[in-house]
């Protein structure tokens, strides 16, 4: 599972997910992509489950790029703990995703295979997503 090797600070504030994604919203590496339609925190486990579903489906052919990285620690307090006495310990890592962000890219496979692989990956994610095709690829077919 993905997580940072080291961070400057152990804990972060939650923040807000307002507006659209400007960075990471264009297709850069592959020919097909999965784009987020809603804001969400995507955990490293969800990213890994999606990656496994895609790689299992496309087998040897093609290449996958993961365009998001879980760099935000989410803290939790132990169950049945009284209020106060500080913030909890980091439990897992999330990637903050805004609408329009490209999540995964695929190249080296046909559109049908890519579409099905992305559909399997999208099932593992807690948000609505959209399948995107690079414009040059559409013209060739």
Swiss-Prot record:
GO molecular function: rRNA binding; structural constituent of ribosome; tRNA binding
One Pfam family per UniProt: Ribosomal_L16
CDD domains for the chain: Ribosomal_L16_L10e
PROSITE patterns named in the record: RIBOSOMAL_L16_1 (PS00586), RIBOSOMAL_L16_2 (PS00701)
Assigned keywords, A-Z: Ribonucleoprotein, Ribosomal protein, RNA-binding, rRNA-binding, tRNA-binding
GO cellular component terms, A-Z: cytosolic large ribosomal subunit
One GO term of the biological process aspect: translation
SUPFAM superfamilies, per database record: Ribosomal protein L16p/L10e
Gene3D superfamilies: Ribosomal protein L10e/L16
NCBIfam families the record matches: rplP_bact
Complex and partners: Part of the 50S ribosomal subunit.
Family to which this protein belongs: Belongs to the universal ribosomal protein uL16 family.
Role: Binds 23S rRNA and is also seen to make contacts with the A and possibly P site tRNAs.
Protein name: Large ribosomal subunit protein uL16
Originating gene: rplP
């Amino acid at each position: 599972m993905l997580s940072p090797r080291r961070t400057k600070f152990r804990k972060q504030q939650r923040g807000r997910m307002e507006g659209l994604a400007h960075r990471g919203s264009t297709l850069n590496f592959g020919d097909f992509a999965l784009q987020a339609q809603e804001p969400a925190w995507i955990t490293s486990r969800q990213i890994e489950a999606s990656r496994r579903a895609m790689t299992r489906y496309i087998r040897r052919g093609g290449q996958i790029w993961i365009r998001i990285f879980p760099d935000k620690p989410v803290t939790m307090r132990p169950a049945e703990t009284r209020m106060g006495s500080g913030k909890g310990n980091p439990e897992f890592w999330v990637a903050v995703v805004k609408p329009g962000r490209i999540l995964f890219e695929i190249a080296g496979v046909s559109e049908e295979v890519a579409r099905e692989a992305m559909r399997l990956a999208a099932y593992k994610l807690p948000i609505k997503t959209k399948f995107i095709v690079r414009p040059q690829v559409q013209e060739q077919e």
